[in-house]
Amino acid sequence: MGLETEKADVQLFMDDDSYSRHSGVDYADPDKFADSGSDRDPHRLNSNLKVGFEDVIAEPVSTHSFDKVWICSHALFEISKYVIYKFLTLFLAIPLAFAAGILFATLSCLHIWIIMPFVKTCLMVLPSVQTIWKSITDVVIAPLCTSVGRSFSSVSLQLSHD
């Protein structure tokens, strides 16, 4: 139908002087960040996220719209997806990344400094607690249960129909 299926390749070239002058940050190794644009999802965390036109909108063979409608809807889908995604990431990506960083830093701090020491302390104290609990059970609960069991074992019931 005349649709272009190849992805557009966009590159931005800046010399080192203008890059460090405009950004205000002097990165130690610019080559480290040079390839970061090629694969931003190396662990395939979002592999199930299908946002291609063919993955979202499909017409069966028996019902096809006009070719011009299909081409225009495909173009409008791609343009709106591109523009809206860029717009949303422009305003939401940095605050959400900041919030996620705070959240993960807080959870990491809690895990490292509170939860794991508490778990290790419980595991350290557990054998002593187990010994004390066994002693209390043997001294108090076992004789009590034995005496209650003997008392109820001597009870006999007889039912009579009058």
Curated annotation (Swiss-Prot):
Going by the UniProt record, its keywords in alphabetical order are:
Cell membrane, Cytoplasm, Golgi apparatus, Membrane, Nucleus, Phosphoprotein
Top-level taxonomic group: Eukaryota
Q: Which residues lie on this side of the membrane: Cytoplasmic?
A: 1-86, 108-162
- What's the protein's topology in the membrane? Peripheral membrane protein
According to the UniProt entry, the coiled-coil residues are none
Question: Which cysteines are disulphide-bonded?
Answer: none
Asked if the record carries the keyword Cell membrane, the reply is yes
Q: Which residues carry this modification: Phosphotyrosine?
A: Y19, Y27
Give one GO term, molecular function aspect. Answer: molecular adaptor activity
Q: Where in the cell is it found?
A: Nucleus; Cytoplasm; Golgi apparatus membrane; Cell membrane
Intramembrane features from the record: 87-107
Asked whether the UniProt record includes DNA-binding among its keywords, one would answer: no
A Pfam family that this protein carries is: Caveolin
Q: What is its main location?
A: nucleus
The known PTMs are summarized as: Phosphorylated on serine and tyrosine residues. CAV1 promotes phosphorylation on Ser-23 which then targets the complex to the plasma membrane, lipid rafts and caveolae. Phosphorylation on Ser-36 appears to modulate mitosis in endothelial cells. Phosphorylation on both Tyr-19 and Tyr-27 is required for insulin-induced 'Ser-727' phosphorylation of STAT3 and its activation. Phosphorylation on Tyr-19 is required for insulin-induced phosphorylation of MAPK1 and DNA binding of STAT3. Tyrosine phosphorylation is induced by both EGF and insulin (By. similarity).
**What GO CC annotations are associated with the protein?**
caveola; cytoplasmic vesicle; Golgi apparatus; Golgi membrane; nucleus; perinuclear region of cytoplasm; plasma membrane raft
Biological process, per Gene Ontology:
caveola assembly; cell differentiation; endoplasmic reticulum organization; insulin receptor signaling pathway; mitochondrion organization; negative regulation of endothelial cell proliferation; positive regulation of dopamine receptor signaling pathway; regulation of cytosolic calcium ion concentration
Give the family per the record.
Belongs to the caveolin family.
| Stated role | May act as a scaffolding protein within caveolar membranes. Interacts directly with G-protein alpha subunits and can functionally regulate their activity. Acts as an accessory protein in conjunction with CAV1 in targeting to lipid rafts and driving caveolae formation. The Ser-36 phosphorylated form has a role in modulating mitosis in endothelial cells. Positive regulator of cellular mitogenesis of the MAPK signaling pathway. Required for the insulin-stimulated nuclear translocation and activation of MAPK1 and STAT3, and the subsequent regulation of cell cycle progression.
Q: What is this protein called?
A: Caveolin-2
Q: Which organism is it from?
A: Felis catus
The gene designation is: CAV2
